[in-house]
């Protein structure tokens, strides 16, 4: 083998070695992209969130508005219940405002949801599951802590005794729910369905106090005028 041939084969060998390295680097980056976990203070169906993680108030809210007074709301028809999550009775207008959720929407965006009871959330690019990191300072009106146990309790309550619309959504969308810590809970969604809206859907479920229902023995399915 002459010197020219030797140099040619040496260069060819180095080329193939470099190509193999680049190939595996590309595969690694693709795998990272597929499995990359997004951590955020909210989630949007369309594009980017309007508000960043340290926003102090919504643009349409006056942070210096006077506190106190009363609000009068009109609505068609009548009501005999302040429990909007049971089939019994006709619930009053705005009766759902007494219940909070992990996420909440805004009035100046479409398809965006931000942490309310949840401080932050984690989910993969394909949105096949979501983890909610809850605010440890969150409490119910009776001053009892609001924890992942309450979220799990609420999920099961809605699944077994909630409105048919809630049961249908849960049955169609949610595969499993796991408590990962006192203030951390994971929703895994069913395969074979569009996942774009599922993290926000799971985060919108109302949260009920497990302590209240266990201690009082209250019937979740009963109509009541007690908020």
Residue ranges and their predicted role:
Residues 1-14:
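N-terminal secretory signal peptides that target proteins for export/translocation
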Residues 24-32, 133, 158:
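Hydrophobic membrane-targeting alpha-helices
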Residues 113, 166-169:
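Short, surface-exposed helix-loop/turn micro-motifs enriched in polar/charged residues
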Residues 168-221, 225:
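Surface-exposed binding/hinge segments that line
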Residues 34-126, 133, 156, 223-227:
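N-terminal lobe/hinge region of extracytoplasmic solute-binding protein
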Residues 14-28:
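Bacterial N-terminal signal peptides
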Residues 61, 87-94, 120-164, 178-180, ...:
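Aromatic- and charge-enriched surface segment that lines or borders ligand/interaction sites
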């Amino acid at each position: 083998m002459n010197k020219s041939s030797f140099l040619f084969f040496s260069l060819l060998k180095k080329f193939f070695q470099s190509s193999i390295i680049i190939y595996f680097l590309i595969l690694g980056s693709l795998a990272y992209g597929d499995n990359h976990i997004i951590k955020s203070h909210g989630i949007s169906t369309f594009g980017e969130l309007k508000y960043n993680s340290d926003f102090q108030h919504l643009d349409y809210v006056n942070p210096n508005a006077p506190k106190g007074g009363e609000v009068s709301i009109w609505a068609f028809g009548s009501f005999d219940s302040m429990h909007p999550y049971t089939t019994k009775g006709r619930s009053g207008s705005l009766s759902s405002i007494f219940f909070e959720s992990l996420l909440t929407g805004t009035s100046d965006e479409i398809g965006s949801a931000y942490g309310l009871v949840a401080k932050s959330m984690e989910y993969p690019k394909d949105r096949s599951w979501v983890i909610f990191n809850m605010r440890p300072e969150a409490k119910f009106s009776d001053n009892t802590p609001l924890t992942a146990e309450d979220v799990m309790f609420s999920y099961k309550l809605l699944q077994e005794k909630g409105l048919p619309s809630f049961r249908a959504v849960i049955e169609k969308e949610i595969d499993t729910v796991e408590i990962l810590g006192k203030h951390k809970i994971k929703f895994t969604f069913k395969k074979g369905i569009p996942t774009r809206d599922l993290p926000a859907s799971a985060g919108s479920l109302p949260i009920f106090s497990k302590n209240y229902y266990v201690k009082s023995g209250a019937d979740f399915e009963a109509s009541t005028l007690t908020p």
